[in-house]
Design a protein with these regions (language model features):
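Often metal-dependent polyanion-binding catalytic scaffolds in large enzymes
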Residues: 1-395, 409-416
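A ubiquitous, low-specificity "background" feature that marks scattered single residues
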Residues: 251, 427-428
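Active-site-proximal beta-alpha loop/turn segments in soluble metabolic enzymes
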Residues: 403-407
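Conserved small/polar residues in nucleotide/adenosyl-binding loops
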Residues: 421-427
Length: 429
């Protein structure tokens, strides 16, 4: 789509609606609005003119207060500026909601669907085989990063979601109530978010974006390429930083890594439980319904801590579903088999981990840990290890025989490095 067309749509669907909803915001009985909302346009004008005249921020504010609130004390000025920040924060949230509500129309996602265009073009040019071959070696990895300043509190995220829906349906009354809720909801957090808090915030995006989107993309490709052999996990995967990025967050420990991975596993099983309940409503046939109910019960038992794991691996679950699929095709005219196959694709994509934790650590910490291990466990590596080439060092590290006595290590960073390495070994193997 031409840039001009996008700009026009943005002006009509976001900027004009912003004027409407911001006007609603100004009518609400909110402290920040009453103290700051009406003066904000004047402060904006003073800032523009002051910068144009070469004034610094302190001079701009002094001139503004002398012109519009000359009797304000220093404390009152500080309080006023704080209210300005509160008000602007909520204006930004309003814009976020308006942009989300208008995104598909602004960008004409149905018309500019690049994936659909690609598939249709390969069909018209008889290049389906080439596309299949390309996809067999293609992979895209979405990385969900984390930083405390990136996140709205959970309550604000929920308001954005509901406000987006109200805007899309032109429900002015509900939007006004949500704006009032927004004005009374704090944006600050009493404590800095922990790595577990960051993980919980990002799981919101896994739930509300990634799960359905990746499932839809996999279904679309396999339907239009007429194949069920795509490697969904390799084609689209998700990396997850919270709980693993030790080089970026000193509060990440092996215990946090384990807790985040358990949280991710529980969340994806909750999704599978929801989906299998929907499937069970359709697969009401003899024997098949019993098998689907067994799967549902196993999911439920793991989530309620009645059993340690519902299945030994995703492959075990897929093997059971393959048998159900064969029975559907052989005995029940393949009825609703598409729903079962779509569910299998999600299992192939997300496994029981949902997103893979990106375990990262400063190389200096790893080197220091290795040095301490060699000092306390000299027989583990050859005496010439330091003189080996990099490839030879790697080969020797992977061929180590023997066990590590963790109680001999004294450095906290070494203890944590060994602990999280031990956690990841079953996955790597």
């Amino acid at each position: 789509m031409a840039k001009r067309a996008v700009k026009d749509h943005y002006e009509n669907l976001v900027e004009l609606k912003y004027q409407l909803y911001n006007s609603l915001f100004l009518t609400l009985p909110l402290d920040a609005v009453e103290q700051a909302g009406l003066l904000l346009p004047l402060l904006e004008e003073s800032s523009h003119s002051g910068l144009a005249d070469g004034l610094d921020p302190e001079e701009i504010l002094e001139k503004f207060f002398m012109s519009h609130r000359p009797s304000m004390t220093e404390e009152a000025r500080a309080q006023f500026l704080f209210k300005i920040i509160q008000y602007v924060e909520r204006q930004v949230v309003l814009i976020d909601a308006l942009e989300d509500a208008a995104y598909s129309e602004i960008h004409r996602t149905e018309e500019s669907n690049k994936l659909r265009q690609l598939v249709e073009r390969t069909e018209s040019d008889a290049l389906q085989r080439e596309l299949k071959s390309t996809l067999a070696s293609f992979g895209a990895r979405v990385i969900l990063t984390a930083h405390p300043t990136q996140f709205y509190p959970g309550a604000v995220l929920a308001i954005i979601t509901d406000l987006t829906e109200a805007v899309q349906s032109n429900n002015i009354a509900t939007a006004r109530e949500l704006l009032q809720q927004l004005g009374n909801t704090p944006f600050y957090q009493k404590e800095n978010p922990s790595p577990l808090d960051e993980a919980s915030q990002l799981i919101w995006y896994l739930d509300n974006v990634c799960y359905e989107a990746i499932g839809d993309i996999s279904d679309y490709l396999e339907k239009y390429l007429d194949t069920d052999n795509l490697d969904s996990e390799s084609l689209l995967s998700i990396g997850f930083w919270p709980g693993g990025d030790r080089d970026g967050n000193p509060f990440v420990t092996a215990a946090i890594t384990k807790e985040v991975s358990a949280k991710l596993r529980a969340r994806i099983i909750e999704w599978y439980l929801r989906d299998i309940k929907v499937i069970r409503r359709r697969l009401s046939f003899p024997e098949i319904s019993e098998k689907i109910e067994e799967i549902e019960q196993l999911f439920h038992k793991e989530l309620t801590n009645q059993i340690p794991a519902c299945f030994s691996s995703p492959k075990e679950l897929i093997s059971i579903l393959n048998k159900v699929q064969s029975s559907l095709e052989d005995n029940y005219q393949g009825l609703f088999v598409d729903k079962l196959v779509s569910f299998k694709r999600k299992i192939q994509s997300f496994g029981f981990h949902f997103a893979s934790l990106d375990i990262r650590q400063d190389s200096r910490v790893i080197a220091s840990t290795l040095d301490e291990i060699l000092e306390t466990h000299p027989p583990l590596l050859s005496s010439s290890f330091e003189n080996l080439k990099e490839a030879e060092k790697i080969a020797e590290l992977f061929s180590i025989q023997g066990s590590l006595q963790i109680e001999l290590l004294s450095s906290p960073s070494s203890l944590d490095t060994v602990s999280y390495t031990h956690l990841t070994l079953p996955t790597n193997r």
